């Protein structure tokens, strides 16, 4: 007997209902498994998406699901008495797109930035990317966490 399973998954698709609806779920499946490497236990999480708005939704989707991964790892740790660390997060999307109504904004802001900024520069105003320990990133994650908490309350 082991304290983990290979069967831990959540499926959002309802075959008898979703093919006929105008708004079927974009997130189709979440699969989790505890893996052991170098005598440490990690929670691996894979998600499979039917469709994803790359410009307006993907960031919060990734934030929310990696927060869920942390929560699940903590719950398993508490229930088993074994330390479970957050492991790899693998995100698979079949249709990753930008809606036409957002393309002008995407072109004017995002693509323009690609031509005018370095991939990484310590000066944030000259950089396309930031480190995850940057105060602005930490503040952004905290803001996202608050949005999720407020959404849960409503």
What label would you give each PLM region?
Residues 1-65, 70-154:
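Active-site helix-to-loop segments that bind/position phosphate- or nucleotide-bearing substrates
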């Amino acid at each position: 007997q082991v304290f983990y399973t290979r069967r831990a998954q959540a499926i959002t698709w309802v075959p008898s209902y979703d093919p006929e609806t105008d708004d079927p779920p974009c997130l189709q499946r979440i699969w989790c498994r505890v893996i052991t490497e170098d005598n440490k236990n990690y929670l691996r999480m894979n998600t499979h998406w039917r469709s994803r708005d790359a410009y307006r939704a993907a960031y919060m989707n990734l934030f929310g699901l990696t927060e869920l991964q942390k929560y699940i790892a903590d719950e398993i740790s508490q229930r088993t008495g074994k330390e479970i660390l957050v492991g790899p997060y693998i995100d698979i999307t079949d249709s990753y797109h930008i809606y036409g109504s957002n393309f002008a904004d995407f072109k004017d802001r995002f693509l323009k930035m690609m031509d005018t900024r370095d991939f990484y520069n310590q000066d944030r105003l000259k950089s396309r990317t930031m480190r995850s320990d940057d105060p602005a990133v930490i503040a952004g994650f905290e803001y996202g966490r608050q949005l999720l908490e407020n959404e849960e309350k409503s």
